[in-house]
């Protein structure tokens, strides 16, 4: 049984930055360090940081006064920032810069009084944070998840309207929604550059190429990871069996029956150590040759805050 690895896979620049912020804060300051929401959607990463002294909370009222708190990679609403400032909490912001770009789009629309449509998944923390950038009662912000939502959408002024997107959606699905938006609202403004992040696009392209060569695809990632779920969907659309797994322990031997080629990829929040463990398990189950697809080289780096760029000397 051949094992093929997708390329690129795993951590993106935004995830690297977010984890590094928590990691360095734990090294520099005395724990506990509070993190609002899971810093990234991966159980392995969260458990590792928790063991080192990170305390994950959902709301700031769980954080003691004068504590250090880190905002997750998904971003937060303006009301959360205001509360943190009011309570004199020391903040480190791990919001992905590409999410911040979408926040700025929505903020500009709010200041102009232009209504905004956000394409995203209800309840996802990135969506909650992005919706929370809009605060102009003269306008409005609306969440849509599918072309069907657009049919029943009513806005105040279709001539002053823009749209933005959650960064981790399927590129193809977003294209269909945008097409429907432009058909209903011909004057709608869109971002100058697609909101779907480079890493999401690259990993979706890579998993499609992987699925075309595979009899089975395993996507390493947690079930609450939007981008990991999209990878599993993309592989399935090619016509192969595809499963989302948290770790090698989730692999079922019956999946491998009559499989000659198994493809492996990982969501943007899944560490490479989990991929290596999956490969090791597959080898025990009959895997032999391990190869890696050619893919896009990613060399983007997002810097951590200046206060955390301190070299530790033992």
Swiss-Prot record:
InterPro entries: LytB/IspH. Isopentenyl diphosphate binds at residues 41, 74, 124, 225-227, 269. The keyword Cell cycle does not apply. Transmembrane segments: none annotated. It comes from the Bacteria. One of its GO terms (molecular function) is 4 iron, 4 sulfur cluster binding. Its cofactor is [4Fe-4S] cluster. Its EC number is 1.17.7.4. [4Fe-4S] cluster binds at residues 12, 96, 197. Dimethylallyl diphosphate binds at residues 41, 74, 124, 225-227, 269. It is an enzyme of class 1 (oxidoreductase). Binds 1 [4Fe-4S] cluster per subunit. Catalyzes the conversion of 1-hydroxy-2-methyl-2-(E)-butenyl 4-diphosphate (HMBPP) into a mixture of isopentenyl diphosphate (IPP) and dimethylallyl diphosphate (DMAPP). Acts in the terminal step of the DOXP/MEP pathway for isoprenoid precursor biosynthesis. Belongs to the IspH family. This is 4-hydroxy-3-methylbut-2-enyl diphosphate reductase. The lineage of its organism: Bacteria, Pseudomonadati, Pseudomonadota, Gammaproteobacteria, Alteromonadales.
């Amino acid at each position: 049984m051949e094992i093929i690895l997708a390329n690129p896979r795993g951590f993106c620049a935004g995830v690297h930055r977010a984890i590094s912020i928590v990691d360095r804060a734990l090294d520099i300051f005395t724990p506990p360090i509070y993190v609002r929401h899971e810093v990234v959607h991966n159980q392995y990463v969260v458990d590792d940081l928790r063991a080192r002294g990170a305390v994950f909370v959902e709301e700031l009222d769980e954080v003691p006064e004068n504590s250090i708190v880190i905002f997750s990679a998904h971003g937060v609403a303006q009301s959360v920032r205001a509360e943190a400032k009011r309570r004199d909490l020391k903040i480190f912001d791990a919001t992905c810069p590409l999410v911040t770009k979408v926040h700025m789009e929505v903020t500009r629309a709010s200041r102009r009084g232009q209504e905004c449509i956000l394409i995203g998944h209800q309840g996802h923390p990135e969506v909650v944070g992005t919706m929370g950038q809009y605060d102009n009662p003269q306008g409005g912000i609306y969440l849509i998840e599918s072309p069907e939502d657009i049919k029943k959408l009513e806005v105040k002024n279709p001539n002053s309207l823009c749209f933005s997107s959650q960064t981790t959606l399927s590129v193809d699905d977003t294209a269909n929604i945008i097409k429907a938006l432009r058909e209903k609202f011909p004057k709608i403004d869109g971002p100058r550059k697609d909101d779907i992040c480079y890493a999401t696009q690259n990993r979706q392209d890579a998993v499609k190429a992987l699925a075309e060569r595979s009899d089975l695809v395993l996507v390493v990632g947690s079930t609450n990871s939007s981008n990991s779920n999209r990878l599993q969907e993309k592989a399935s659309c090619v016509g192969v069996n595809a499963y989302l797994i948290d770790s090698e322990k989730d692999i079922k031997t019956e999946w491998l029956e009559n499989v000659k080629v198994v493809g492996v990829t990982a969501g943007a929040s899944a560490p490479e150590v989990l991929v290596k463990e999956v490969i090791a398990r597959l080898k025990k189950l009959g895997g032999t040759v391990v190869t890696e697809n050619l893919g896009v080289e990613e060399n983007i780096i997002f810097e951590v805050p200046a206060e955390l760029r301190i070299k530790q000397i033992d």
